[in-house]
């Protein structure tokens, strides 16, 4: 009995030391692992999922949140700039919605303080979904099934843009991607990364990339000028934070993007100017770090970046309520 108790105690100590060692390892790194989340309000998240996928929030009845932030494609659309109402070219590359709850603000220029505020923007943007908040409210309120869900979640069946965006934001907060190879390495699995991936991470750290790309999202927590050492050449007119603040000092200052799932979210940069990860790494080295990475270094950094791809959101697609005679009709050609 004493021997068995001693064995169990030693095993417990061994496991405790192992988990403590993994915790210390992660704590000593500039990047932290992502943890799975449970929605604060599961019913609200389910309602938000329905609204996220509902194209009737747009004037055309064709564009939904998922059109530009496709959850089957890394939470983005893989084109330079998104396509809006009547095939209008969007002004800027669509950032991924995955792990977006970790951002200090939303949009490349940070003009929305949170996901709720961000969700309201595209609905009424004439170059995106091109509807109005009032029409979006009428569309949703026209369907009894939606009103029933609003009553269950909010206590009454009143449909407002505030409630619509609150629900969408709650769903988006669930879109995190834990379980990447790099997270497993951070958590103590020394075999999770191969030699090239590990050397790539050391290059990533040693070159200064982690000064901006750090934390659980590997970015998203700060702003930085695009073109610190050398100007970034682009035809895109976006001026970054200056478009929000009006301060010349904020010209070409953008929110640092997350690098989680980066292999899925091409093309890269606010203008979609880098078609491949290799091109993005080369450009960042040159204009942000004043460093010319050689081919082998680029290859190893890219190998590391691909270890940041986590478990993608896995859920059942919503069945949307049917429109009825009271539902405002789409106007795709107007």
Curated annotation (Swiss-Prot):
Residues 315-334 are annotated as: Disordered. Its EC number is 1.11.1.5. Residues 322-334 have a biased composition (Polar residues). Residues 1-26 form the signal peptide. InterPro entries: Cyt_c-like_dom (IPR009056), Cyt_c-like_dom_sf (IPR036909), Cytochrome_c_Peroxidase/MauG (IPR051395), Di-haem_cyt_c_peroxidsae (IPR004852), MauG/Cytc_peroxidase (IPR026259). Its main location: periplasm. GO terms for cellular component: periplasmic space. Heme c 2 binds at residues 209, 212-213, 284. Heme c 1 binds at residues 65, 68-69, 270. The keyword Oxidoreductase applies. This is Cytochrome c551 peroxidase. It catalyses: 2 Fe(II)-[cytochrome c] + H2O2 + 2 H(+) = 2 Fe(III)-[cytochrome c] + 2 H2O. GO terms for molecular function: cytochrome-c peroxidase activity; electron transfer activity; heme binding; metal ion binding. Keywords: Electron transport, Heme, Iron, Metal-binding, Oxidoreductase, Periplasm, Peroxidase, Repeat, Signal, Transport. It holds the Pfam family CCP_MauG. Binds 2 heme c groups covalently per subunit. It is found in: Periplasm.
């Amino acid at each position: 009995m004493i021997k068995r108790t001693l064995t169990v105690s030693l095993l417990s100590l061994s496991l405790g030391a192992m988990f403590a060692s993994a915790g210390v390892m992660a704590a000593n790194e500039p990047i932290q692992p992502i943890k799975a989340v449970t929605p604060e309000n599961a019913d609200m998240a389910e309602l938000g999922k329905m609204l996220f996928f509902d194209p009737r929030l747009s004037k055309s009845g064709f564009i939904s949140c998922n059109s530009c932030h496709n959850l089957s494609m890394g939470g983005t659309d893989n084109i330079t700039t998104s396509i809006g109402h009547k095939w209008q070219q969007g002004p800027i590359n669509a950032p991924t919605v995955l792990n977006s709850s970790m951002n200090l603000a939303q949009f490349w220029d940070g003009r929305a303080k949170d996901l709720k505020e961000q969700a309201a923007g595209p609905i009424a943007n004439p170059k995106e979904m091109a509807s109005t908040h009032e029409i979006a409210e009428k569309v949703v309120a026209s369907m009894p099934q939606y009103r029933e869900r609003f009553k269950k979640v909010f206590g009454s069946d009143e449909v407002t843009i505030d409630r619509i965006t609150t629900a969408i934001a709650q769903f988006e907060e669930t879109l995190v991607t834990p379980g990447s190879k790099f997270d497993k390495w951070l958590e103590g699995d020394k075999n999770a990364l191969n030699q090239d991936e590990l050397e790539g991470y050391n290059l990533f750290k040693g070159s200064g990339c982690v000064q901006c790309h750090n934390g659980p999202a590997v970015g998203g927590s700060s702003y930085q000028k695009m073109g610190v050492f050398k100007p970034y050449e682009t035809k895109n007119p976006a001026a970054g934070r200056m478009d929000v603040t009006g301060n010349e000092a904020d010209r070409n200052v953008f929110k640092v993007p997350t690098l989680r799932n980066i292999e899925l979210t091409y093309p890269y940069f606010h203008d979609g100017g880098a078609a491949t990860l290799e091109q993005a790494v080369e450009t960042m080295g040159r204009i942000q770090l004043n460093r010319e990475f050689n081919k082998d270094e680029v290859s190893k950094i890219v190998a590391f970046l691909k270890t940041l791809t986590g478990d993608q959101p896995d859920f059942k697609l919503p069945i949307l309520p049917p429109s009825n005679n009271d539902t405002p009709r789409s106007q795709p050609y107007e």
